């Protein structure tokens, strides 16, 4: 949906996303959706699926979109279903017990850097085996209580879909990810403004927003250069995984 702001001579168009507000009885679902623990917990994943199987499939198994688009009628049905509410409480209790386990202090902390992380289909920041392996490292660190902090990129454009041109040529179509519909949180300063990293580069400074992904007990921080403090040449650094020319690849690395 587009929202027109008409207080200027020329119309300004802004994106407007219509979402559902969760009742207080269902707020635990929101916390579960914002931590990828459910990805490798079968009861957590099946809980989201059973809230609305059709919407779960159409959302690409994205619990954030699922909860945003869950109808008020369906919410009422869930809250009236004692078995479902007990199930939500059970999964949430499992999650809290998992998160309460202390981190190991007998080993050094680990900083892990990767261009891609394969964690779930909803977060399109990986391409193949390397990303899946990196994602598995984080999950295993979480299960083992190993103190790890992971760093990567939040790519504006995720996977591409292919189509054919009129002359039979394959065309790669990239659709931008809507960060408001992803299981991520923007890192903010104490004053409430977005945190901005400054990265020195020959002749200029590149600026980066930071987004946090909760992966069980682990934190994955993703950098994003696609905002107006950067030039158009630097905004594309985090547009695509392994995308662009060699200079852009060097910038990413």
Q: What is each model feature region?
A:
Residues 1-253:
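Catalytic cores of carbohydrate-active enzymes across secretory and cytosolic contexts
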């Amino acid at each position: 949906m587009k929202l027109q702001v008409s207080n200027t001579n020329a119309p300004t168009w802004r994106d407007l996303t219509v979402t559902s507000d969760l009742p207080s009885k269902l707020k635990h679902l929101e916390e579960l959706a914002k931590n990828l623990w459910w990805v490798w917990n079968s009861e957590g994943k099946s809980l989201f699926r059973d809230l609305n199987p059709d919407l779960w499939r159409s959302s690409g198994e994205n619990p954030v979109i699922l909860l945003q688009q869950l109808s008020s009628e369906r919410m009422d049905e869930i809250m009236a279903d004692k078995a479902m509410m007990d199930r939500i409480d059970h999964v949430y209790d499992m999650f809290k017990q998992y998160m309460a386990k202390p981190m190991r202090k007998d080993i050094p902390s680990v900083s892990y850097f990767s261009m891609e992380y394969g964690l779930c289909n909803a977060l399109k920041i990986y391409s193949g085996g390397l990303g899946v392996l990196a994602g598995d490292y984080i999950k295993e660190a979480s299960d083992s209580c190993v103190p790890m902090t992971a760093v990567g990129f939040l790519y504006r454009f995720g996977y591409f879909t292919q189509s054919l041109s009129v002359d039979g040529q394959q065309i790669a179509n990239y659709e931008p990810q809507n960060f408001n519909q992803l299981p991520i949180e923007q890192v903010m300063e104490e004053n409430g403004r977005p945190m901005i990293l400054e990265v020195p580069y020959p002749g200029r400074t590149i600026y980066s927003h930071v987004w946090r992904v909760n992966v069980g007990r682990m934190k994955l921080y993703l950098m994003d250069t696609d905002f107006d403090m950067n030039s158009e040449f630097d905004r594309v650094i985090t547009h695509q995984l392994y995308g662009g020319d060699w200079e852009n690849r060097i910038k990413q690395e």
